């Protein structure tokens, strides 16, 4: 099947909602970083906040490339901000996990390994383009020309329908796209590695912060990482297997969920930490 044509306003609204979610999440994470009352550590929230802002900037570039310039490239300048977003998120989640001095049981290690293997398999399969058998057209049946048969007539050339020319992208954008295209395979593999690390770190985060008063905010962060993984895997699958795919499909809503869940987690952490500090003062 081919990509479904979506109205321009729909794609703009989708990008707008993603940007609002990640921008709000970034500001709330930075508020936690600036606050001395945060229990889980300020550096943790600095890293996650940098990840949110990196995604915000990368998505801004990608939206301008796709909607503003009408280019659907394999690599865009936004990719050079999406990749640091993985690094910052992984760094922040790792610091949060290490602060718990995690001691997993054999069953928990088994769950972690199983999810890692499944995450690798899903990410690799989603990125690999499918090769359907029906792509090859069957050979045309021809009849031999006999002496009694009329001579084969040359094909009649029909004048092609005049189509509206697509909007021409600026020369600098086309030149930049041509320079970045050779890096497409490398960046695709970086996304696979980033997605796998993200889902493993999210699982570890759930195991580390399953109970306790301050665990709720980190469960939201873990679910945010899972949402990011789902949206990213879908996008890799769609761009590799759906011809003329346009962004804005329903699974991409998980990117919006991801930003919203980080914002909720950061707000909960701030609320619980400031209440804890106020309670100590009254005590």
Language-model segments: what does each one mean?
Residues 1-283:
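Polytopic alpha-helical membrane-helix bundles and their juxtamembrane interface segments
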């Amino acid at each position: 099947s081919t990509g479904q044509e979506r109205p321009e306003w729909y794609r703009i609204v989708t990008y707008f909602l993603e940007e609002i979610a990640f921008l709000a999440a970034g500001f709330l994470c930075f508020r936690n970083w600036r606050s001395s009352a945060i229990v889980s550590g300020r550096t943790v929230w600095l890293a996650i906040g940098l990840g949110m802002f990196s995604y915000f900037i990368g998505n801004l570039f990608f939206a301008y490339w796709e909607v503003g310039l009408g280019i659907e490239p394999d690599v865009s300048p936004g990719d050079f901000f999406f990749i640091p977003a993985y690094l910052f998120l992984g760094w922040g989640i790792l610091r949060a996990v290490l602060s718990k001095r995690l001691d997993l049981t054999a069953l928990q290690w088994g769950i972690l390994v199983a999810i890692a293997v499944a995450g690798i398999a899903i990410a690799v399969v989603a990125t690999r383009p499918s090769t359907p058998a029906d792509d090859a057209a069957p050979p045309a049946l021809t009849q031999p020309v006999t002496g009694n048969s009329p001579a084969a007539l040359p094909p009649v050339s029909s004048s092609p329908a005049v189509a509206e020319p697509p909007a021409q992208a600026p020369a600098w954008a086309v030149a930049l796209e041509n320079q970045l295209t050779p890096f497409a395979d490398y960046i695709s593999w970086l996304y696979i590695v980033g997605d796998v690390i993200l889902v493993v770190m999210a699982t570890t985060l759930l195991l580390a912060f399953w109970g306790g008063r301050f665990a709720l905010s980190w469960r939201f962060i873990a679910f945010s990482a899972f949402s990011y993984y789902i949206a990213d895997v879908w996008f890799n699958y769609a761009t590799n297997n759906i011809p003329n795919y346009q962004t804005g499909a329903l699974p991409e809503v998980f990117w919006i969920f991801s930003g919203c869940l980080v914002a909720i987690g950061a707000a909960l952490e701030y609320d619980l930490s400031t209440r804890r500090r106020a309670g100590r003062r009254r005590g």
